[in-house]
Amino acid sequence: MSSNVVETIQPVAAAIVSAHQFELVDLEFVREGQSWYLRLYIDKPGGINIEECAMVSDELSEKLDAMEPDPIPQAYFLEVSSPGAERPLKKEADFQNAIGKYVHVGLYQKLDGKKIFEGDLTAVTPTTLTIDYLDKTRHKTVTINREQISQARLAVKF
């Protein structure tokens, strides 16, 4: 059900966001406990502010309320926010822009005994990512097939 909601709402949300020259980073419809959440993550060069998030929220809420049939028949919370410092990497442009940055990559199955890699993204191809990471005190490099990746995002290095 949540994928159908996202497929229905994505073009509406994308039109509103792009009309303001913002980027729709991600859109998700998820259940947490007893509540449903429609979450949009938007951004622009230099960062997005709270007023811009509120403006997109108001416009999207108005459009969704006017849609027939209702794309989300149950009660839900609409949240519009910045992707934050740990921005998800989903589109090809996201990966290209992340080259040289510190990333967190989770895998479906272990590779070299690990399911999570955090390190500097050094190369991106249409099928792979290459990450330089620290294993205890040794620098290592791993190349990961994209099909193995469950999720990827920028990460904050401590």
From Swiss-Prot:
GO biological process annotation, one example: ribosomal small subunit assembly
Principal cellular location given in the protein's record: cytoplasm
Cytoplasm keyword on record: yes
InterPro entries named among the record's database cross-references: Ribosome_maturation_RimP, RimP_C, RimP_C_sf, RimP_N, RimP_N_sf
Gene Ontology CC: cytosol
Keywords noted in UniProt: Cytoplasm, Ribosome biogenesis
Places the protein is found: Cytoplasm
Regions that span the bilayer: none
CDD domains for this protein: YlxS_C (cd01734)
Family: Belongs to the RimP family.
Entry function: Required for maturation of 30S ribosomal subunits.
Record's protein name: Ribosome maturation factor RimP
Gene expressing this chain: rimP
